[in-house]
From Swiss-Prot:
Its EC number is 2.7.7.85. It catalyses: 2 ATP = 3',3'-c-di-AMP + 2 diphosphate. Forms dimers and probably also hexamers; the dimer may be active while the hexamer may not be active. The keyword ATP-binding applies. It comes from Bacillus subtilis (strain 168). This is Cyclic di-AMP synthase CdaS. Disruption phenotype: No effect on antibiotic sensitivity to the beta-lactam antibiotic cefuroxime (CEF), upon overexpression of the c-di-AMP phosphodiesterase GdpP increased sensitivity to CEF. Double disA-cdaA mutants cannot be made, suggesting they are lethal, while double disA-cdaS and cdaA-cdsS mutants are viable. In single deletions of this gene, germination efficiency is decreased. Induction: Expressed under control of the sigma-G factor in the forespore.
Amino acid sequence: MKAMRYEQISENAFKGKIQVYLEQILGDASLILKTLHEKDQCLLCELDDLGHVFQDMQGIASSFYLQSYIEEFTPAFIELAKAIKALSEHKHGALIVIERADPVERFIQKGTSLHAEISSSLIESIFFPGNPLHDGALLVRENKLVSAANVLPLTTKEVDIHLGTRHRAALGMSGYTDALVLVVSEETGKMSFAKDGVLYPLISPRT
């Protein structure tokens, strides 16, 4: 799986990049229409190229909105982003709760206290398979890793039967509080985040 490229980006820069992608998509789609009936046209190739542009645009949007949702509440956006990127590459499952305005501890079964500075290497080690702390949620508050191996409430809503426990827990916690919950699937390595009881994919752009 391609790794997601995170970078801090301003709203104006984000919109500028999206505009460039949209203009490219419109231009490419227009060209496909003009040559649609030509015998030597490789339609599958051109649609594949167009899909790559969409993927890159979705990746930029994923990074920007994730940043905008959490940077007010923790200065460690880049460290968190680096950690889930690495965990995704290795298909190490992870569940990270980023506390925002609502206190979350009354909704969780507390695990092991950490009160450590946020670093990508520490987060990666926590979720390394076999680590006693990996099977649970990591709680982030401001610039601290507060605790690990926390048990979260599962969503009570009907969800896709293919969603695992981590994703159900992310939906549950983000439904009870305004916390943002990051998830990495250990089966696929796919990244996502839950906000307001809804799960959003973190799309990987090409590198």
